[in-house]
A protein has these predicted regions:
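Hydrophobic alpha-helical segments
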Residues: 1-192
């Protein structure tokens, strides 16, 4: 049972319903996290817009941003975000071996030096951000522009927020929408 209720499509304003419908079209569900945030429409709107800007704009590949999101979620022990973003990462071309290899990325041949620097940033920001040195930043900057560093930091920071929110609520992974929910939103179910 959820610690805080998750609002159904029928319980939100028409404006938020449009965002729910976009989630249903794009993902086949409305993430429980966002259904919980819907209790505060202003926060819901800004969080969905922020997530879109962080993950889907800029010059870095979304695959790389999702890779650091998965590592951040591993470090925070957030099953909810891990389930969702592992699936997204796999769809974007990350392999199951790479997902598993994130746990020992320093010794893994599965990641480029640029990817290792991004993963290191995820660990530093999540576990010991005050200790991230000028030398570490210079190593990161060998591979990424200032704007790209901002993109990485925004993804890592955003998911530290999302992870902690979901951990406190003991949020279970979002299930696919029912045929009824999809029909209500005018979304055709995907046939297997």
């Amino acid at each position: 049972m959820p610690r805080i209720s998750r609002l159904n499509r029928s319980e939100v304003s028409p404006e938020l319903r449009d965002v729910y419908d976009k989630f249903l079209r794009d993902r086949g569900n409305v993430p429980y996290f966002f259904r919980t945030l819907a209790h505060r429409p202003e926060i819901f709107r800004t969080a969905t817009a922020h997530m879109h800007a962080v993950l889907n704009t800029g010059t870095l590949p979304t695959r790389l941003k999702e890779l650091v999101v998965v590592r951040t979620s591993q470090l925070n022990g957030t099953a909810y975000c891990l389930a969702s973003h592992t699936a997204i990462s796999l769809r974007l071309g990350t392999t199951a071996e790479q997902i598993e290899g994130l746990k020992d990325w320093r010794n893994s041949p599965l990641f480029s030096e640029a990817e290792k620097q991004a993963i290191h940033l995820a660990e530093a920001m999540t576990l010991h951000s005050l200790e991230y040195s000028d030398v570490e930043l210079a190593s990161l900057r060998r591979f990424y522009s200032e704007g790209e560093v901002v993109e990485l930091m925004a993804a890592i920071g955003l998911f530290n927020y999302f992870n902690r929110f979901n951990n406190v609520l003991q949020m279970e992974p979002t299930q696919p929408a029912t045929a009824e929910e999809l029909a209500e939103a005018g979304v055709e179910p995907v046939s297997a």
